[in-house]
């Protein structure tokens, strides 16, 4: 499914904000509970450390802080849509987004959760952009937030070393496809025949993942999706200033970039410091890249993600030059 931006009406990114827990857990600490060590983890994932929430801190807590940061980044204090992409809602029912909106003082805003696992943020970006373009709303807060420490078995080496907790958000506003920050094209897809590759079994409490199978599917699918999205945006891949992929595994990012023939300096990666933060990974990477001066106003960004479901999605965005607001909480 594609959502191309027709005419001149469109959505633009005007702010970006993040929230990371204060607690840092490095590979040595993780290794104490597992048959592994820093060298093994780093060589296979590129991860050196991850963040973990304190007991009692929820996905909603992180989402509120990241959402407030994105609003502050854009110089706004309100919006009419809050879309929360997450696999770890605070409750099974009701959705977490309405409570997040209320805590942000947005009591009349539409709000709902979206579940597309690690593709969730790109799905949310696409849905919110389409709603703005259609005139359903004027300003939308898209938040990706996950607390995977709540669904990962600490004794499972295949998942315990991979995931971290965090949240990231962007503010989208009605604008023009020629404006800085424009979301030019998004593309989404899924394949339910692979739903067992990343799953929480019906009778289980923890996430399970078939890593080698996920790697193969992710590399092929992310490259195809990114290539198609760039073409629909009217870009040659050589025109892409920064490739911002889901931070699942450094090997995946490197392999996808090679297939797209993008040089390493154009690949945004912060997985070493935050690990795989699921729906939060792309906005966290965007904020870090902006804070470090790796992306600037007018840069062409190619975003792509792959997650459980199986789901995937990509977006072509012209960066607005928004200054990120990056916060922490316990």
Swiss-Prot record:
GO cellular component entries: cytoplasm
Alphabetized UniProt keyword annotations: Acyltransferase, Cytoplasm, Fatty acid biosynthesis, Fatty acid metabolism, Lipid biosynthesis, Lipid metabolism, Multifunctional enzyme, Transferase
Active site: 118, 246, 276
Classification via InterPro entries: ACP_syn_III_C, ACP_syn_III_N, FabH, Thiolase-like
Catalyzed reactions: malonyl-[ACP] + acetyl-CoA + H(+) = 3-oxobutanoyl-[ACP] + CO2 + CoA
Gene Ontology MF annotations: 3-oxoacyl-[acyl-carrier-protein] synthase activity; beta-ketoacyl-acyl-carrier-protein synthase III activity
Record comment regarding domains: The last Arg residue of the ACP-binding site is essential for the weak association between ACP/AcpP and FabH.
Protein name: Beta-ketoacyl-[acyl-carrier-protein] synthase III 2
Organism: Streptomyces coelicolor (strain ATCC BAA-471 / A3(2) / M145)
Taxonomic placement: Bacteria, Bacillati, Actinomycetota, Actinomycetes, Kitasatosporales
